[in-house]
């Protein structure tokens, strides 16, 4: 990950993360990884048969990329834009993907997939989402001796980046718990005598299929004030007057959305 910075003062600055290169392990045969732990952030592992076998934890996660922009003329007239994005990892095998961990398998905002069987075996299996966010803020103020106006607008929005486990057969085998949150487990039938399309999930304790709550908010404040002149005639006379008025408008909305989990098979689903 590299970060590009431009800073010409608080009202003229930008910072953005980007991925310069992605770590990759690839083979046309079997890709076999063995060790104490396996951790990936925006990495890629592929092969015909991909096997990761560790004593403790497998973590297939994402890399956080941030952006922050602010520009304007002064503290009353400017715009701010901030965002957070997630770049996930990938573990794939054309014929199969086998993940074995002595403790936990954690897949977060990433993909594990094969045209054949995908099998995860561990104490706990966690297939989870990541969150992305976007924040905007606008300030505008103008006026003169006779009138003034101001505007302040803010918004915030979250979105889910779910994990996906996909294969012709998907097997999840946990001694304790299986947790699936705002993510997808998909089994698609292939060709041949045993096309698959089955999901088999077994746990010693609980299988939890959960949703993720996402926050969003919006606020807008407008104010204006100023002098105005009024003219009237009647009864053979003519009158003129000056009045002063103020107006304000304030809107606020806060809400939540829900990102759900999906288990979809073209064959059988056994929990």
Stretches with model-predicted labels:
Residues 1-270:
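Binding/recognition "hotspot" determinant
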């Amino acid at each position: 990950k590299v970060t590009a910075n431009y800073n010409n003062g608080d009202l003229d600055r930008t910072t953005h993360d980007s991925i310069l290169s992605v770590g990759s392990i690839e083979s046309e045969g079997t890709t076999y990884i063995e060790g104490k732990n396996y951790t990936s952030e925006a990495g890629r592992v592929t092969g015909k048969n991909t096997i990761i076998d560790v004593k403790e934890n497998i973590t297939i996660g994402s890399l956080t990329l941030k952006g922050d922009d602010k520009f304007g003329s002064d503290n009353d007239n400017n715009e701010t834009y901030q965002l957070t994005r997630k770049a996930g990892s990938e573990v794939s095998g054309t014929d199969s993907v086998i993940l074995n961990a002595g403790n936990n398998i954690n897949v977060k905002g990433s993909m594990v997939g094969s045209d054949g069987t995908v099998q995860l075996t561990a104490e706990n299996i966690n297939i989870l989402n990541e969150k992305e966010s976007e924040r905007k803020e606008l300030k505008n103020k103008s006026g003169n001796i006779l009138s003034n106006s101001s505007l302040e607008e803010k918004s915030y929005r979250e979105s889910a980046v779910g994990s996906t486990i996909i294969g012709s057969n998907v097997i999840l085998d946990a001694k304790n718990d299986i947790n699936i949150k705002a993510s997808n487990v998909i089994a698609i039938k292939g060709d041949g005598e045993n096309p698959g399309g089955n999901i088999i999930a077994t746990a010693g304790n609980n299988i939890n299929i959960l949703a993720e709550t996402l926050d969003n908010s919006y606020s807008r404040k407008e104010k204006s004030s100023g002098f105005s002149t009024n003219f009237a005639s009647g009864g053979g006379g003519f009158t003129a007057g000056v009045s002063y008025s103020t107006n304000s408008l304030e809107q606020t909305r806060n809400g939540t959305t829900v990102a759900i989990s999906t288990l979809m098979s073209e064959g059988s689903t056994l929990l």
